Every structure is written in C-alpha cells, then in structure tokens.
Amino acid sequence: MTIKEKNNYIVNRDISWMYFNRRILDEASNETNPLLERLSFLGIYSSNLDEFFQIRVATLGRMIELEENMHPINTNSKKVLKKILKLNEDYTLDFETIFMDLKSELQKENIFLVNELEMTPSQEKCVDSFYREELMNSLFPILVSRMSVEPKLNDKSIYLAVKISNTVKHEKNDKKEYALIEIPTGEFSRFFVLPKEGEKTCIMFLDDVIRYCLPYIFAQLNHDKYEAYTIKFTRDAEMEFDNTAYESVLEKVSKGVKSRRDGLPVRFVFDREIPSDLLRFTEKLLKIDKRDVHVCGARYHNLQDLISFPKIRRSELKYKNHPPIPVRAFEDSINLISLIRKKDQFIHCPYNSFDNFIRLLRESAINPEVKAIKISIYRLAKNSKVIMALICAALNGKKVTAIVELLARFDESSNINWATKMRDAGIKVILGIEGLKVHSKLAHITARKGNIACIGTGNFHEGTATVYTDFTLMTAHKGIVDEVESVFDFLEQPYLNPTFKQLIVAPQYMRKKLISLIKTEIDNAKEGKPAYILCKINHIVDSKIIEKLYQASNAGVVIKLLVRGNCSLITGVPKQSENIEALGIIDRYLEHCRIMIFANGGEERYFLGSADWMLRNLDFRVEVYTPVYDTDLQKQLKTVIEFGLKDNVTARIVDGSGKNLINYTANETPFRSQEELYNFYKRNYEYSFIEIEKQIT
C-alpha cells in the first residue's frame, strides 16, 4: 500500500479521537440514559477534552513549528489541527445545546440551576451566611491592574475575570479595575445546594455564588458595578527530560511534574459575553497569542465538575444499583492459591469485585508457603489496599518486588509517593525501564507447592475497578507462570533477552506475533477453513496492523471489532475493508478490556492483555497478552464480545465517518450489552447457588 493509499484508508488518530469523544457527548443526549447520568457524560466529555488539549493539541503545535521550518506551506499537522478545531467548534455548540436541554429536563423534575439574579430572599440569606462563615477566607482576588509581580496561575483551575467600575462617573474614583478570582473547587464543591423550598431543589454554581458576593469581596474599592466572566486556560502538559543531566529517574520525573506549571498555553476558553477590554487585558496577562486556540463559549467552563453533580436522593434519575456479583468458586474456597492451582480463575470487574484480587494478595501476605510476590504497577487508588497488602507481606517476611511506572500520565506524583512508602517498608522498588513504559498488568506469587500468576487488562486500582470493565486471569499454568516470571526478570535486568512461547510480549515480539496471527487467518481463508477475528480493544491506530487487517478482509477473513476509543481503520470500503465491522460502546462502565479471538481454522485461540494496537504499545512499552486455555473462561470471553456486537442501544457504528450512528435496525428488540451481561452473570451465580442447594438436599 502506498503512502497516498494509506492516507485514503486511515483516519488520523487525533481526528478519530474527536469522533470517540463525540460518542460520549451523544450519550448525554441519549434519552435511554437516566437524567443525572446524562449530566455526568457531559462532565466526562469535558474532562477528556481538557487532557486532549494538554497533550495531543500541544504536541500538534510543536509539530507544526517543526514542519513549518522544513516545509512552510500546507503542513500536514496544520491540516489536522484545523480539522480538530472545526470539530471542536461544532461540538462545543452541541454541548451547550445539550446542557440547556438538560437544565430544562431537570426543571421538570423540580431541580433548578439558579444564578445570582434568580434567588429568593431566603436563598440570598443562605448564600450570605455561606460566604461569611465558610467561603470568604478561601477567596484571594488578584487586582491585576495593580500587581507588580506576574502571577503563577493554575491551568487546572477556573477563574472569574472581573471588571470593577461605577455606574455613574465620579471625579475622584473613575478608574476601572480588573481582577482575577480563582474559584476554589479544590476546597468546595463546584455546586452549592440551597435549602429546599417546597418540592424544589435549587442548586447554584460556585461561580454564581462568588458573583453574588462581589460587592462584599471588593467593598474597600468604593465601586458599585461588578462584571464577572468565567475563563479557563490549558497548558502544554507534555514533560520533557534532559537526558544529559546526571539525575535519577525519580529526580527527572519530579522536575517534569513541576515544569507543567510553566507549560505554554495551548487553549483559552472564555465567556462569549466578556467585554472586549477585559478580554484583551486577560489575554495579555496570560500571554495568550493568536496561535493559541481560542474557544468562545457559554457562561460556565470546566464542566468536568458535572461528574460530581450533587447526589440528589432521586434513585430513578441514576443508573440502577449493580452490586458486584460474587464469584462462586471464591466464596466456596478458604485458600485462593489452592483454588487457582486446581483451575484457572477470572474476575471481570466491575461485574465482579476487585476485592477478590486484594483477597489473594492478603492471603499471600500471611500464607506460610508463600515466599515472594512480584507486581507491576501503573496506576493506584488514593488509599490503595493493594499497596497495604504488599507492605503487610513485606513485614511478614515475604520478598516483595514492585515495578512502578513513574511516567503514568498525571499519576506521576502519586506513584512517586507510593514508591517511597513501599521502599520505607522494605519492598524492593524498581522504577521502570528508561525509554520503555511498563504498561503490563502482572503479578507473580512464588509458593512452595507451586507458583501462580495474574495477568490483567487493567490497573490494579480498586477505584477504577468500579467503573472500568477489565479482566484478570489467575492461573497456575506452568508455561504461563514461568514466562510471567521471565518478564519480571527482564524488568529487573533489562539487558536480558528472554524468549516466550506462551505470552505475547512487547516490545520484543508483539508486533511480529500479531501480524503472524492475522496472516494465519488469511492463509486459512484462502484454503476455505474457518477464518475470522473477533477483537475487543480500546484503540486501533497502528498503520501496519490496519494494513494487515485490510489484507485479511480482502482474503475473506471476517473481522468484527469492538473499539471504544481511537479507530483509524475505515470499515466497509469495497475491495479494501468490506469484511470489517466496528462498533464503539459508551455506557455506564468504561469499556477497557483487550480481548482477541482468532478462528485458527476451527481451533479458536483466545488472548487477553494490556496492549492496544498502537505504535506506542507495540514498540515502546512493555505489554503482555496471555493465552486463555480454560474452556469455561473462553466461553466467558466469547459471550462478552457477542453481547457487545449485539448491542443496539449504546453501540455506535465506527466506520471512520464520524457520524456515530447507533447500531440499530428497525423493529429490533433493544439489547444493552452491559445491562445484559450483568444479568447474565447474575443468573449464572444464582443458578450455581440453586444447584449447590439441590446437591445438599
């Protein structure tokens, strides 16, 4: 395939990301979702967009500068950025429309978002008290028209840009003042719930509470007119390291985290009603220039806070409660290590509880036959029970080794703190490998009667395990367990070059193995044997993998994909990808599993692991896929993919067009895969309970 042909059949990764985030925005307008969950989708959309500008748009800006120095006209990055900004402009207008629609829907439920001009006298009295008793001493206005030192502003915060003047001109005090007030959302909720009046629940943005209090805040200035407009800016958050400096990885990452405060602005968002003089003054203060992205928006920004909208006691406006379903085998066992030795086990979070994994670590920490525990760590919960179990094991005399990836984006500081705590407890901590991110999710437990290993698709993080769908395989299969230990040997001694027969490991072998697996399907299709690929993954953007999938499609291989995020592959193109279908599911849980099933001529091969089909995962990270041999677990993986492909409520067609049409045919019975999967697991658990009772009686 020539470069020109590739460009025709591959969507740019950043544009495909915009299409993905649009699917989240679409769920905010999806009336099958409960009302307060639709607000949450707006928050998720906003949060994602912030990070996208911090990393990807900032990177595009640097690439444009580089390309302009080489080829000044029509750089490719410039075209991509132009397309992104046009999509962002369109999506921003849709976001505002959806938000206003949801406000109207809230009013039908007697929930009102009121501003500073819409309060009743009793509500004003309540806000007065809140300001004087709690809020006042957390507000530190900067009179920017008088300041002598340039302020260090936080791009994670939102600010009110305030213009202070007089309604009637005074000879002695006719000077306008400009001020900035950081809205203290780190200390207070973004939303202030007013006392209930009858059946009405009234809620204010903290921004509006502060607007109401401006006469109190600036009382000493002797002005009587206050205009306040929300602004937000985003800095370049990519970290750069001086590899010539003689510093430890820990020191380099610590410096990199601090340097984010000095990153150049890449986006400036402001209220479209802001007066031109205040806008110019603010731009000058923040050093915003014409090259930075300007987003002219509505009254409120940083709406990621909608994720934490007040918990109103209206259960019908939220998702139905889905408590984790117990794993029957775990319930019936007092020794998980012995259980796993007898038969491979799965936990599928959040359908099953992550507590099962913590239980395994806790049991290992006190089990006399356990000698050592090794684990790879990418992201951790704020109060990590995983770390507590590892520390417990170390204190009980076990040899504990933790591979901690310091460069897990935006979790660097947290991982540095945890690494320090573990070292203080006597745990051997290895801070990754220079030049390679350790993204694999592995644990290895050495025990006298036989070792076991855990291989996961997601982080060992009890927080995200309640909202991310992830599998963890627990196995005593000797070939797999020994090779997991070999991965840890490599992480401890990167000069080693281990070989693998069971695991698919990046960066050494994964790309080559994936290409080989796809080629086998191509060969089988040509020979008339069963040939198909079923895959559930987060992102597909690697051009070489996509090219091989196109070849497979042309050879007659049926390819069905569930792709949550970026998808650079274009489906349904005649003589190119007509045998490829792709769906993206956005629902109450974030789809995070990576599962691969290959027909293999009728003897299916099953894999799960940590890697997406991206250049970074295949060539620049330590990633692991494991085969799944247990037939019961294979059936479970197949069910997950089949349910996803059948979804016609939250699954959208991912074909490269960005239309994101729902995967629905007229007169179909609604099938929501996450809901159906939960019910499936629940029925299986209840059925197993009934069978046990029958045996007892």
Where are these regions (language model features)?
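N-terminal localization/anchoring segments of enzymes in phospholipid and broader phosphate metabolism
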Residues: 1-533, 551-555, 565-589, 593-697
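Glycine/threonine-rich ATP-lid/beta-loop region of ATP-binding domains
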Residues: 543-550
